Curated annotation (Swiss-Prot):
Keywords: Porphyrin biosynthesis, Transferase. Belongs to the HMBS family. Binds 1 dipyrromethane group covalently. It comes from Ehrlichia canis (strain Jake). This is Porphobilinogen deaminase. Tetrapolymerization of the monopyrrole PBG into the hydroxymethylbilane pre-uroporphyrinogen in several discrete steps. One of its GO terms (cellular component) is cytoplasm. One of its GO terms (molecular function) is hydroxymethylbilane synthase activity. Its EC number is 2.5.1.61. The modification S-(dipyrrolylmethanemethyl)cysteine is found at residue 239. The lineage of its organism: Bacteria, Pseudomonadati, Pseudomonadota, Alphaproteobacteria, Rickettsiales.
């Protein structure tokens, strides 16, 4: 059996795809795997803030199109790149075991965000990070930065920024943890929905593929992603919506989730404990609660 895996061509995307291919090879050694690199709109338009050109869906658009027309059999994505609603006819039956969901501070000159001087410049591609940085340190000059991880680190090293904020999981996957100066606690920098998680997407009617990739699924990671994405869908969030959510198990059946929503003038937070069987419902309830707190009842 041959399986074609669609992925972006970045170093990070290929590292994530390698995790999937290694698992497939472990469980199904008879399968012949071909990795198909696909350049997405988000890769092509890499000089301007992503929220100004269509949002995070641009990182998966062409890959989903390739799936739908049968050019590839499955696709590997970062969960945080998946918009609230994706293409009809596709499903995500598998989330790999989640890596770190946290953000990190990277700088060649400073050891922490707290140690940054007044009016220091911090680079980030995320409006979620921007509003939380400005809440923590209103004096900071938060500036958009695009490009792959190495490009962003280089921009910081050569002095374009005093520091940058990145996802720890990406640095782990490409063996760049040595640049990390500070892991940011979720109490000051709550994570993006699905941050640190890799998912596998396929056609909804391709039952042979579905049955195979379900074997790779990490149940707890999948349930946490369901809870976080239910919150995202309720907000109908996109790249220009400052929101955050992190769900984590506290025991074998109980999950704790924190959420944040902002209109860039104020932020509202909510948290709760729930059983895994209530993951989707709890995400919806938290979304409705924060919408009501920020905007009032509709």
């Amino acid at each position: 059996m041959n399986i074609r895996i669609g992925t972006r061509g970045s170093v990070l995307a290929l590292a994530q795809t390698l995790e999937v291919t290694n698992l497939l090879n472990r469980y199904f050694p008879e399968i012949n795997i071909q990795v198909v690199k696909i350049k997405t709109s988000g890769d092509i338009n890499n000089k301007v803030p992503i929220n100004t050109i269509g949002g995070k869906g641009l990182f998966i658009k062409e890959i989903e199109e390739a799936l739908l027309i049968g050019k590839v059999d499955l696709a590997v994505h970062s969960v945080k790149d998946i918009p609230a609603f994706y293409c009809d006819g596709l499903i995500i039956p598998c989330v790999l075991k989640r890596s770190s969901p946290y953000d990190v501070f990277v700088s060649s000159k400073y050891q922490s965000i707290k140690s940054l001087p007044i009016n220091a410049t911090v680079g980030t591609s995320s409006i979620r990070r921007k509003v939380q940085l400005n809440y923590l340190r209103p004096d900071l000059q938060v500036i958009p930065v695009r490009g792959n991880i190495d490009t962003r680190i280089l921009k910081s090293d050569i002095g374009e920024f005093d520091g940058i904020v990145l996802a720890e999981a990406g640095l782990i996957r490409i063996n760049k943890c040595n640049v990390i100066k500070e892991v940011l606690d979720s109490k000051i920098m709550l994570s993006a929905v699905g941050q640190g998680a890799i998912c596998v997407q396929c056609r909804a009617d391709d039952y042979n593929i579905i049955n195979k990739i379900k074997v790779l699924n990490c149940h707890k990671s999948y349930v946490c992603v369901i809870a976080e994405r239910s919150f995202l869908k309720t907000i109908n969030g996109s790249c220009d919506t400052p929101l955050a959510a992190l769900a984590q198990y506290v025991d074998s059946d109980t999950i704790y989730m924190s959420c944040m929503l902002s209109n860039e003038k104020e932020m509202v937070f909510s948290d709760c404990y729930f059983k895994e069987c209530n993951a989707e419902e709890s995400g919806i309830d938290m979304g409705k609660k924060l919408i009501n707190e920020l905007y009032g009842s509709c």
